[in-house]
A protein has these predicted regions:
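C-terminal motif of bacterial Sec signal peptides marking the signal peptidase cleavage site
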Residues: 14-17
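Bacterial signal peptide processing site
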Residues: 19-22
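Post-signal-peptide N-terminal segment of Sec-exported extracytoplasmic proteins
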Residues: 24-26, 31-72
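Non-transmembrane, aqueous-exposed alpha-helical and coiled segments at domain scale
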Residues: 247-250
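Signal peptide-directed extracytoplasmic domains
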Residues: 58-103, 114
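Mid-length scaffold segments of soluble, non-membrane domains
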Residues: 95-165
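Positively charged n-region of N-terminal signal peptides that target proteins for export
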Residues: 1-4
Length: 250
């Protein structure tokens, strides 16, 4: 009888302990993420990343001083740079073009954030969960694959406006590029130029600049995404903390 009483008492204590433990777990364990929270959190992350990236790139030297995304002359123009000393004033002309190209990209970056804000509204619930559980740059890859063409068509006209702006001595980026390539093509097209194996340069500057600027932008957004995924301090809102915090223990 005594043993039975002791056993019953022990079970009662154990049951009480389990009940208390469950209460504690309910208090500290995060609630399961809802579909709406996942979608809202990812949209918030993309918008935050886009705004942060575009904000930095739109500053003076945002592109020019960042060696990872600095927009240089097209590969087709390498021969110009390599042989620029043969053209009077060529060194300064090349640097002026590079500066103006990057200024154009910085100017266009001011308009990028609203484009991304509009684009992320198309994200579905399935997309959201795939991105949340995907690679560290899954959101950036999704955004690139689903919006690049639209962003290009929206971004290129802004680039064109920027390259046509008069910046230094009343000369635009496009005019500087055309002057540079025009001088080179005049030489490359001569008999001496052809015998030397030089080719003319026919790169369309607005197309080239748009692609390079967007590549740089997506690179920076990928960096922002990685911060939000890995760095708790980068999750600047409660929703970001909850959505991406669910990945920390995995």
């Amino acid at each position: 009888m005594k043993k039975r009483i002791l056993m019953i008492a022990a079970l009662a204590v154990l049951a009480a302990g389990c009940a208390e433990l469950l209460k504690v777990l309910e208090t500290v364990a995060p609630a399961a993420l809802t579909e709406q929270e996942v979608i809202s959190g990812l949209k918030e992350a993309l918008i935050t990343g886009a705004k942060n990236s575009a904000g930095r790139l739109s500053l003076t030297d945002g592109y020019y001083s960042d060696l990872a995304i600095k927009v240089l002359l097209p590969e087709e123009a390498k021969v110009i740079v390599d042989n620029i000393s043969k053209i009077p004033g060529g060194d300064k002309l090349v640097e002026d073009v590079i500066i103006r190209i990057n200024r154009a990209a910085e100017d266009a970056a001011k308009e990028v954030a609203p484009v991304f804000v509009s684009a992320v509204t198309q994200m579905t619930i399935a997309d959201g969960f795939n991105i949340l559980r995907g690679e560290d740059n899954a959101a950036t890859q999704y955004l690139h694959s689903t919006t690049y063409n639209e962003l290009y068509s929206l971004y290129k006209p802004k680039i064109a406006v920027s390259t046509e702006k008069k910046i230094i001595a009343g000369i635009s980026t496009k005019e500087s590029w055309e002057t540079l390539t025009g001088k080179w093509n005049s030489f490359a097209g001569t008999l001496a130029g052809r015998l030397a194996g030089f080719n003319t340069v026919n790169t369309e500057i607005d197309d080239y600049l748009t692609k390079k600027a967007l590549d740089g932008l997506f690179m920076k957004i990928a960096e922002e995404e990685l911060k939000i995924r890995k760095d708790v301090s980068a999750r600047v809102t409660p929703l970001l903390q909850k959505v991406f915090g669910s990945l920390d223990a995995k």
